[in-house]
Swiss-Prot record:
InterPro entries: Papain-like_cys_pep_sf, Peptidase_C19, Peptidase_C19_UCH, USP_CS, USP_dom, Znf_MYND. Residues 226-301, 317-366, 750-793 are annotated as: Disordered. Recognizes and hydrolyzes the peptide bond at the C-terminal Gly of ubiquitin. Involved in the processing of poly-ubiquitin precursors as well as that of ubiquitinated proteins. Involved in the regulation of organ size. Acts as a positive regulator of cell proliferation. Possesses deubiquitinating enzyme activity in vitro. The enzyme activity of UBP15 is required for its function in regulation of cell proliferation. Functions antagonistically in a common pathway with DA1 to regulate seed size. Zn(2+) 1 binds at residues 130, 133, 150, 154. Keywords: Cytoplasm, Hydrolase, Metal-binding, Nucleus, Protease, Thiol protease, Ubl conjugation pathway, Zinc, Zinc-finger. It comes from Arabidopsis thaliana. This is Ubiquitin carboxyl-terminal hydrolase 15.
Length: 924
């Protein structure tokens, strides 16, 4: 065999290893050099463009060709020869007026240049003229670099006369390099805009034609062709290398914030021996411009000399949400809609009122900013606009070609809503009658899921939203979606047939929680929390998830509108009487039922009664600078639209169950358990009950069933696939585990005072588990760091029901002895008998006497109602005193309930018309 020689190995190494490495290094360096060269060329090009822009700003509106000056001089000489004996004075006045006109036009040009880029390259070989004597200019203003002078004397005189009020530094002006022409498709008002607002001069300027002054010099015997050419400061248009001094000013649309609606009009009053002068009046009296992330309110009557900011009539309007109007020097209100990082514009509208006087109407709007709806109230100061006088902000922004801002003021964050509350009100108040409950197949210990799904499908606002199928139309998820699955499930309820199956929901829920859907018996409450949390995450998925959305915005989703409420925790130091409050969102209430609790009202009373913090749970007061005894009290600040109450029947750690009978009302009054400073809720109507049927009082085994009231008001007992209609008495006699209540009318939209929570001033010494007042909430606020931060009720869907699990165990179960041997079942002969409290039993009256009794921790309260029965499905409607508030209104006034009324359960003189007898109600 032929073997390679030893001399070939170095050559092969050189060819196969060294040369590729060297080539790779050289190619890398060559690539870097090429990139640097391209970058250098790009920087040089950008520098050249910047220089061109600076030169454009300097010379665009000030460069006048020398031949135009010569034409003016010839016109002046002609007028001197033509005018009669009194012409000398007329000529002097005309010259002064012409100079004043040029000064005003240049002032308007300087103002227009700020915020609007005008790109019209000017030939450097042109001769510039002096701003005062119109002679050949040799120097220019060192500050604005836009006005030329022939000598220092002219510069000083012109500065004192006019230029000191109009000089604006170059740095404050915009440097954009694009031009915008007012074509037919550029910037237009909405269809309500009056076409007569634009004059012929403006129309000609939009078409790029030269406009002439409308000055009438007939009395002087001078033709308009002999007059000094008017320098239109609206912009310049260059055609090839020729530049006309009569070109119209153009506005720039690239990220520009100013829309000009102005056309210079000239009018003169002349006579034989009377002075004549030129007046220029702008149609657009004022405008708003913004060239920096900071907001600038621009007033046409006042511009600061430093050019950094503009003066307006109401420069501090951003401090007040309702004061959004900016008045100009002409008394015309201009509406400004500030937004950080966004250049906004004010479009003033003019009109003629009945008296013939010209007035300006404030532009009002109601729309969305950055795809988030917010409402702005406006006041009309002139004529009313067409239709309802409301225009969309997005329409204005699209009309002007502006982009949405990514940064906004903090004060507008409180007004943003991920899901409009008005849409939720429509879902809450709509009527759905074509749905009927259908059974669900037990997929293997799935009774807990079936009971929860049956309760959710009877939740009216959720069902109305799912029937609309608005989520599936816009859902971008490629994988399985819970909301889409629920929509399909609700749509199948409209069809008649056999039992449905929730196997798809259970199988996908297992990917979220490994313990759900694997065939083992689980807790219905845990499954409900999982469903609600999943729906909430889906609502936030489009915006990047829970971690990227502001906590305040997370409270404005559809799920929060339905199940979200607000809880207040108040801690009072018993030494210095210092109080600190904190507000937290809640999604449901978990109530203890041990001890003396025999009714739902008792459980709520125990939940809201004050608790002393002492011993190991002492409170650290910042004012006392130590651990002191304190008193803590929980109360509901805002009642949710859908109130979910969980009765804590399962024992913690022993797998036992409190199997006592807890009475609950069909109509629940939450006023005694509210803070009375926030929401004033109406009655809550019961629509679903989940019951846990056990054996041997054990929590690790059993069966879940549900009682639901369909949207027609009929009650059904649903046991997986079996459905049976039942009377109300059977529902009220069951040992409920979960209760679902819905408000009789929706909660008013949250105000700004509810958006901020006070900062707590104290920290706990030791972690403590408060099993007495557990509360489930969805999302902790990031700025809440206070005393109860380690308490169980402040965790995500708190582990307040730590015993509410049903995992199998080999431990011996025990039967919890009921605290009462008597099951207090409310007599349902009267629909109001459910309000009877165990402390004060009232015998049912044959005349259906209404005695609404609620007990709080300190004093009892009552609520009087007028019982009415409509013809629709025998629905009982509760109303307050007719003089206070009618039921059809969406929101009641704050004085809907007289909370200072002393308790009088048997009689009410107001209803009895002065008679000393019990008020009785009969059906009609």
């Amino acid at each position: 065999m032929l073997e390679p020689r030893g001399a070939d190995i170095p050559i092969l190494f050189l060819v196969l290893v060294v040369l590729p490495v060297v080539a790779y290094i050289l190619l890398g360096k060559w690539s870097n050099i090429s990139e640097k060269r391209v970058r250098a060329n790009l920087l040089a090009q950008m520098a050249a463009e910047e220089a061109l822009r600076a030169e454009t700003v300097v010379n665009a509106d000030r460069g006048v060709r020398f031949e135009s000056v010569a034409t003016e001089n010839r016109a002046q000489r002609t007028r001197t020869k033509t005018v009669s004996a009194g012409g000398g004075a007329v000529r002097a006045e005309f010259d002064a007026g012409a100079r004043e006109t040029v000064a005003e036009q240049r002032s308007d040009s300087v103002t227009a240049t700020c915020g609007v880029t005008v790109v019209a390259p000017v030939n450097n070989n042109e001769l510039h003229v002096c701003a005062r004597c119109f002679g050949p200019a040799k120097t220019r203003c060192s500050r604005c670099k836009s006005v030329r002078y022939c000598s220092g004397k002219c510069q000083i005189i012109h500065w004192r006369v006019a230029h000191k009020d109009e000089c604006v530094p170059v740095e404050s002006c915009s440097s954009s390099s694009e031009r915008v022409s007012f074509e037919k498709d550029s910037v237009l008002y909405d269809h309500g805009m009056d076409s007569t607002m634009y004059s012929n001069n403006t129309t000609q300027a939009a078409k790029g034609k030269t406009s002439k002054s409308s000055v009438d010099f007939a009395s002087l015997g001078i033709s308009q062709n002999d007059i000094t050419p008017q320098i239109n400061t609206q912009g310049r248009k260059s055609v090839g290398k020729q530049h006309s001094s009569k070109a119209n000013r153009e506005s720039c649309r690239r990220d520009s914030a100013t829309v000009f609606d102005s056309s210079d009009e000239a009018a003169s009053a002349g006579g034989d021996n009377k002075t004549s002068h030129i007046k220029h009046k702008s149609r657009g009296n004022s405008y708003a411009a913004e060239t920096n992330p900071r907001r600038h309110s621009v007033d046409s009557s006042a511009v600061q000399m430093n050019g950094q900011s503009f003066v307006s009539g109401m420069q501090e309007s951003h401090k007040h949400e309702n004061n959004l109007g900016v008045r100009s020097s002409f008394g015309c209100p201009n509406t400004q809609y500030p937004s950080n990082g966004t250049r906004t514009a004010t479009l003033p509208r003019t009109g003629i009122n009945k008296s013939g006087e010209q007035s300006c109407t404030e532009t009002s709007k109601k729309g969305q900013v950055a795809a988030v709806s917010k409402t702005v109230r406006s006041k009309d100061t002139g004529i009313s606009e067409e239709s309802n006088g409301i225009s969309s902000t997005m329409g204005i922004m699209k009309m002007m070609g502006l982009r949405n801002s990514t940064k906004h003021d903090d004060r507008y964050k409180n007004l943003k809503m991920l899901f409009p509350y008005e849409e939720f009100l429509k879902f809450f108040q709509c009527e759905v009658f074509d749905l009927s409950p259908r059974g669900l197949v037990n997929c293997g210990n799935s009774c807990y899921a079936n009971a929860v799904l049956q309760s959710l499908t009877c939740t009216k606002p959720l069902v109305a939203y799912l029937l609309r199928r608005s989520h599936s139309r816009s859902c971008s998820g490629k994988d399985w979606c819970l909301m889409c699955e629920l929509e399909q499930h609700v749509m199948m309820l409209r069809e008649s047939g056999g039992p449905l199956s929730a196997s798809r929901i259970l199988s996908h829920m297992r990917s979220i929680n490994c313990q759900i859907g694997d065939g083992s018996q689980e807790d219905a409450h845990e499954f409900l929390r999982l469903l609600v949390a999943s729906m909430q995450s889906i609502c936030l998925e489009r915006l990047g998830g829970e971690t990227k959305v502001d906590p305040r915005l997370q409270e404005t989703t559809l799920v929060q509108h339905m199940f979200g409420g607000r809880l207040r925790s108040k801690v009072k130091c018993l030494r210095c009487d210092h109080e600190s409050e904190r507000y937290e969102n809640i999604m449901d209430l978990t109530l203890e039922i041990y001890g003396w609790v025999e009714s739902l009202q008792d459980a709520l009373t125990q939940f809201t009664r004050p608790e002393d913090l002492d011993g190991e749970n002492m409170y650290r007061c910042s004012r006392c600078a130590g651990y002191v005894r304190a008193r803590k009290e929980l109360s509901i600040h805002e009642a949710p639209n859908i109130l979910t109450i969980v009765l804590k029947r399962f024992q913690e750690g022993r797998y036992g169950k409190i199997n006592k009978c807890i009475s609950f009302p069909e109509m629940l009054d939450m006023i005694p358990f509210m803070t009375r400073t926030g929401d004033v809720p109406p009655l809550y109507m019961l629509y679903a009950v989940i019951v846990h049927l056990d054996t041997l009082n054990a929590s690790f085994s059993g069966h879940y069933i549900s009682y639901v009231k369909d949207l027609r008001g009929n009650w059904y007992r649903i046991d997986d696939s079996e459905i049976h209609p039942v009377p109300m008495t059977q529902v009220m006699s069951e040992g409920a585990y979960m209760l679902f209540y819905m408000r009789s009318y929706p909660r008013p939209q949250r105000g700004e005072h509810n958006g901020k929570a006070p900062v707590h001033h104290s920290q706990p010494r030791n972690e403590m588990k408060e099993q007495r007042k557990p509360v489930n909430r969805f999302k902790p606020r990031a700025d809440h760091k206070n005393t109860e931060s380690s308490s169980s009720e402040w965790s995500l869907f708190t582990s307040s029901d730590e015993a509410s699990f049903t995992t199998e165990s080999t431990r011996d179960s025990f039967s919890t002895i009921d605290y009462t041997d008597v099951c207090h079942v409310v007599d349902s002969s009267s629909p109001f008998a459910i309000f009877n409290n165990v402390y004060h039993n009232v015998e049912p009256s044959p005349h259906n006497t209404v005695a609404c009794r609620m007990f709080s921790g300190t004093k009892p309260e009552t609520r009087y109602f007028v019982e009415q029965e409509t013809n629709h499905n025998n629905t009982v409607v509760l109303d307050a005193t007719p003089s206070l508030y009618p039921i059809p209104a969406p929101y009641p006034p704050h004085d809907y309930y007289d909370q200072s009324m002393y308790v009088n359960y048997e009689t009410n003189p107001e209803f009895n018309n002065g008679q000393d007898q019990d008020r009785t109600y009969s059906y009609w």
